[in-house]
Amino acid sequence: AAKLVPAIRFVTSDTGIAAAKVSAMLEGTQHPIHIGSCIAVDHRHQSKVEDFEAALDQLFAQFGDSVARLQKLLDIHLSYPVNAMTRICKKLSLPKKAALEAIGMFEMAYGGGTATAHDVFMAMQEIPYILKSDHAPEGKMLVVEENMARALTLRWGDYDLAKAVSY
């Protein structure tokens, strides 16, 4: 297993949305794992360093929360992990082609047994890697990463159903 280390990403835009965004992630896999939502600091009205400090305080609180949620996924055992992954990808409106590719890779790797929600969440991290490999625009990548981070807040047992699901 890869050793994951905390990281922070700052994103600014000089067109459209006049805000800087800061988000928490874990690095150590082929593509960083986005955990938690982006926190925006409006910079239209000459934001000060203090505004960014407040955003970072909020980010660090959220980061601790998200890491705890990620750890809890280790305790959630899924009887039908492929079905759960498919339902969760669909619920999060993840790009179908990349999601189906990641689901197929997970299905081949795990071989039809049970898995933890953590295993499925980590398998879902192939999706941004696939999109990046296909040269998806940065804006789309940010939306997908934020949507994927929402998986940490879902009730995984609700998606662990025997009935097959189509995407």
Kindly label every feature range from the protein language model.
Residues 3-167:
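Intrinsically disordered, low-complexity regions enriched in serine/threonine
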